Amino acid sequence: MRSIIENFRIVPAGHCGSGAMRNLIYHYCGLDLDEGVVFGLGAGLDTVYFDFPDAQPAFMLFGRGATMEADLADTLGIDYHESVQPDNDLAWQAVREEILAGRPTMLSGDIYYLDYREFKVHFPAHRFILLGFDEDRGECYIADRVNDYPETCSLAALAKSRNPGSSLSTLNL
């Protein structure tokens, strides 16, 4: 089966979370907000430091908080829901149903495993938007922050990105 949302405007961004939210807000609400406004309304400025001596890299420093997207939706009064599903099959069924219903859906995963990304570094809180899939070809179509067109990613890479099993994971946010 193949399903893709064709009428989604992708505007490249400097940051994955604020860029994804800006594109989703435009799609669902018709609000054409600047990425900086999205970041500010989401109270995005924060500092988070993770120290994982056995990981690669051994530490991460973030300039934004973990709840920026939810905070933005709350500030704007927009219906927003995040869910965690550690089972890959159940997670795929949930987002598959969203796409079949014509609803682009933001996902979170480790950027390292997304096979269309050339820069390979572990970042398990990368935000991107699922726009469609082709199960016969084993691929999905993703709006990411770099390009103004959908990226093609294997379904296997998407599953590994969302729940790598052996490293820090966002557990299929």
At which residue positions do the language-model features occur?
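Cysteine-nucleophile protease catalytic domains, especially the papain-like/related folds used
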Residues: M1-N88
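Active-site-adjacent substructure of cysteine-protease-like catalytic cores
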Residues: Y28-Y49, P86-R137, A143
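Short, intrinsically disordered/low-complexity patches at protein termini
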Residues: P57-A58, L130, P164-S166
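Short secondary-structure transition/capping segments
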Residues: H81-N88, F128-L131, C153-S161
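Hydrophobic transmembrane alpha-helix bundles
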Residues: E69-E82, K120-A125, A143-E151
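Noncatalytic regulatory segments and standalone regulatory/sensor domains
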Residues: E135-L173
